[in-house]
């Protein structure tokens, strides 16, 4: 991937609570009860949390020419010092926010803001928003599937946390823990990088500029009635060709999509 200039999205470990006792004392008990296979506290089956993070650090160190996007805020949103020190050590490391704003929002907002401003070029907006047979907004249980209105409320809380200094409001995935979060009120120039510029910088190295538009890959999802399906159906399939840094295309890695 370093040779191709392709970033690697890497998921190592999970919330620290998934290694804590599997009982009602666990702050994520509601989530773990719904997803018992997410519990990794049995040392006979799973490595310790710290061992997984150490392995991640070794991989990033071993491949300095590869850009690693460490999802879920490097899966250590509970420990801002660890993430900050890792970003300091590794210029080829980025962290995304997927499903970790509830954890990040528990910290002192001034501390989080300082970290985000310091590493404003290395943090990516992300949600863990998934569309399979039902919406998944970061996490979920066995209740009714989320609605489009739930999705709007989910994003509103994401924006609120990043853009305002509001205090002690409910976070977007209460199944992940019963606490409130504090907004970090980032400056507009930092928000633009986190929302857009940092991702564009990663993707432009990999995709030809003419097709950097919204795309729908045919097998990705079924329209929910709000999309103009007739427009998508008439769109001409386009090839997204991955290229080496010297501009040489790699046709074997191309993806066909409607653009």
Regions found by a protein language model. Give the residues of each.
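Divalent metal-binding pocket/active-site signature
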Residues: 1-82
């Amino acid at each position: 991937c370093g040779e191709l200039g392709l970033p690697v999205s890497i998921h190592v470990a999970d919330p620290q609570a998934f290694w804590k006792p599997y009982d009602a004392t666990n702050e994520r008990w509601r989530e773990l009860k719904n997803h018992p296979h997410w519990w990794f506290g049995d040392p006979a089956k799973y490595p310790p949390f710290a061992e997984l993070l150490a392995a991640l650090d070794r991989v990033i160190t071993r491949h300095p020419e590869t850009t690693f996007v460490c999802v879920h805020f490097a899966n250590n949103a509970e420990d801002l010092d660890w993430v900050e020190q890792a970003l300091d050590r590794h210029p080829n490391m980025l962290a995304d926010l997927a499903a970790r704003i509830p954890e990040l929002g528990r910290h002192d907002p001034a501390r989080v803001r300082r970290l985000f401003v310091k590493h404003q070029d290395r943090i990516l907006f992300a949600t863990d928003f998934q569309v399979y047979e039902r919406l998944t907004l970061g996490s979920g249980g066995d209740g009714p599937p989320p609605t489009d209105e739930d999705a709007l409320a989910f994003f509103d809380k994401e924006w609120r946390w990043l853009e305002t200094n509001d205090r002690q409001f409910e976070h977007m995935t209460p199944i992940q823990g019963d606490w409130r979060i504090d907004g970090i009120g980032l400056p507009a120039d930092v928000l633009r990088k986190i929302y857009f510029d940092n991702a564009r910088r990663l993707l432009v190295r990999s995709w030809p500029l003419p097709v950097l538009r919204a795309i729908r890959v045919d097998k990705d999802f079924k329209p929910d009635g709000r999309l103009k399906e007739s427009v998508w159906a008439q769109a001409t399939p386009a090839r997204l060709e991955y290229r080496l840094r010297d501009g040489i295309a790699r046709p074997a890695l191309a993806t066909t999509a409607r653009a």
